[in-house]
A protein has these predicted regions:
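A conserved beta-strand/loop capping segment in the N-terminal third of enzymes
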Residues: 64-97
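Redox-cofactor-proximal catalytic regions of oxidoreductases
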Residues: 41-46, 54-77
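Flavin (primarily FAD) cofactor-binding/catalytic cores of flavoenzymes
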Residues: 1-38, 42-44, 86-198, 202-440
């Protein structure tokens, strides 16, 4: 039997791919990366031609941990012969399709990645003190078994379907499947988008451009009271920092949950330029008469029904501020309702080794571990409730990976920043004395 790997990473989105790139030059670490997809593919249903990342190119797989890495976005541009074109373009923000191609380029250089491997079970062997990972090799159906001392989970967040649409018939779809169904949607008489974030805005803008040539009626319903822009001011961006994560993680769970609810416009808002482009396009479309489109704010989806005979959805909506219910009929239905983490079924044998909070979520330690010992199982993008809104941020991925690598190695390999912000988030340390008020 071969020696166990130092770690096995399960799932290969940008976060674990960054870990693969950053551990590649570390001879002391033997890692294996397993993913069920046939190749790297990041949100293929939202690869709109003009869509860009919402973070600058420096938030690539490696640069903020190791600017000299051969896996940097700039090195990708150089090898692709587009360095000067990107420079002349004068935008810090890569196209989303370009970022996906960059990730594919990086993945192709790594021998530690195994695509087409669907993990079925992870167990712990007490006698050998290793994790045993069972996987199906999808192209051949062969059963595979791997062993490792530590596990890193990067299985991503699946599309969230609201309760009102659970079990709903017809051909409604989540925005994750938008592009492959776009032509079929545009053949319908009416299309409705439900959701409030960047994906909903991008799809609305995309469909609004073609509304004249296809003749459909287009509706966008959002529960938010307005179309919130993504807050991107510099002092706010300092909250994507190690010290804010320190501060947030130390807060009581109830406070963290309350803050996360109030932080949605920090990571779920809409690019302000896109909001303005939508308004300008609406202005153009209304020059020669009313454009067949509606924008509904403060509008929650309460229930939904599907009539196969007419291929029509009837949505039960509620205007939240007025408390008034109404219905809306549509043939096409797109749910831009986000993604939510679910615990992978393959972890069931490890339930007793994992630390859980009172709400049944991972009790994620500051070092991103979830096992009760705090040193064996680590998570990527599953710690929103413990580490805050920076969890899905590509810009903090290299920092998190540097922290995880420090735990895997037992020492710091990439310098881990501890303080980068000008502002202070917590009260000063040390004894605090009440202010003495002198009598007047």
């Amino acid at each position: 039997m071969s020696a166990p790997h130092d770690f096995i990473a399960i799932g290969l989105g940008p976060f674990n791919l960054g870990l693969a790139c950053l551990t590649e030059p570390i001879d002391e670490l033997d890692g294996l990366f397993l993913d069920d997809k046939p190749s790297f593919d990041w949100h293929p249903g939202m690869m709109l031609e003009t869509s860009t990342l919402q973070v600058p190119f420096m938030a690539d797989l490696v640069t903020l941990a190791d600017p000299t890495s051969p896996f940097s976005f700039l090195n990708y541009l150089k090898e692709a012969g587009r360095m000067y074109s990107f420079y002349i373009r004068e935008s810090f923000y890569p196209l989303r399709a370009e970022y996906n191609d960059y990730c594919r380029w990086a993945a192709a250089k790594l021998a530690s990645i195994r695509f087409g491997h669907q993990v079925t079970t992870v167990e712990y062997d007490e006698s050998e003190q290793v994790y045993v990972v069972h996987a199906d090799h999808l192209p051949t159906g062969e059963k595979k078994t791997y062993r490792a001392r530590k596990i890193v989970l990067g299985t991503g967040t699946p599309p969230h379907i609201p309760e009102a649409c659970q079990g709903l018939g017809g051909d409604f779809l989540h925005n994750a499947d938008y592009l492959e169904n776009k032509a079929a949607l545009q053949a319908k008489d009416s299309i409705t988008i439900v959701g409030s974030g960047q994906s909903a805005a991008e799809i609305y803008h995309d469909l609004l451009q073609d509304i004249d040539s296809h003749g459909y009626h287009l509706t966008w319903a959002t529960r938010s009271p307005r179309f919130f822009p993504l807050e991107y001011t510099k002092l706010t961006l300092e909250m994507t920092s190690p010290e804010y994560v320190d501060y947030f993680h130390a807060l009581p769970a109830a406070t963290r949950d309350r803050l996360n609810a109030s932080h949605k416009n920090l990571y779920k808002g809409i690019n302000s330029e896109l909001i303005n482009e939508i308004f300008d396009l609406l202005y153009q479309k209304n020059l020669h008469g009313p454009c067949p489109t509606r924008l509904l704010t403060n509008t929650a989806l309460v229930e939904a029904a599907y009539d196969p005979a007419s291929a029509t959805y009837t949505l039960g909506l509620r205007q939240e501020e007025q408390g008034q219910d109404f219905t809306h009929a549509t043939q096409g239905l797109i749910l831009a309702t986000g993604y939510r983490y679910t615990t992978p079924r393959f972890l069931a044998p490890l339930t007793d080794r994992i630390a859980w909070d009172d709400a049944g979520r991972y009790a994620v330690a500051r070092n991103y571990s979830i096992d009760t010992a705090g040193r064996d199982i680590f998570v990527q993008n599953a710690e929103l409730h413990t580490h805050g809104f920076v969890t899905p941020d590509l810009g903090m991925a290299a920092y998190r990976n540097s922290c995880i690598i420090r735990e895997l190695l037992g020492r710091e390999y990439y310098p881990v920043e501890k303080s980068i912000a000008f502002q202070e988030f917590a009260a000063p340390a040390g004894p605090h004395h009440p202010v003495e008020v002198s009598p007047v």
